[in-house]
């Protein structure tokens, strides 16, 4: 109701990566979101995880507020400037041994004054 811009919520330890909008009623995401949320996985969880699990399409279809979901291990890197917030999802292809390769799986930007995710 207060229409506050630039609201970003960071959470973690979900063992998955997520990015999406937050609405007052998440079951009916209509209009502009009230905030943006980034959920980061942990880098030290058991198992290598996967980019997209078997239920990916179904899960995304019933959660239209989400713009990204990934189950690989890693971390997020966030940068805030006066004009844009940027979040990078860094993931490893495996953590089960030391040969895992780190990559940037997805990057999102939020322009100042907005509560909308944009792939960067």
What are these model-predicted stretches?
Residues 1-120:
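Long, structured stretches of catalytic cores involved in phosphate-ester chemistry, encompassing
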């Amino acid at each position: 109701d207060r229409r506050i811009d630039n609201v970003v919520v960071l959470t973690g330890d979900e063992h998955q990566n997520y990015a999406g909008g937050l609405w007052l009623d998440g079951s009916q995401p209509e209009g502009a979101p009230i905030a943006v949320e980034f959920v980061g996985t942990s880098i030290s969880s058991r198992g290598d995880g996967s980019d997209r699990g078997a239920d990916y399409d179904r899960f995304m279809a019933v959660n239209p507020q989400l713009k990204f979901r990934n189950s690989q291990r890693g971390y997020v890197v966030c940068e805030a400037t006066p004009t844009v917030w940027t979040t990078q999802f860094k993931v490893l292809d495996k953590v089960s041994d030391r040969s895992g390769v780190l990559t940037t799986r997805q990057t999102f930007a939020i322009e100042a004054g907005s509560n909308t995710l944009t792939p960067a």
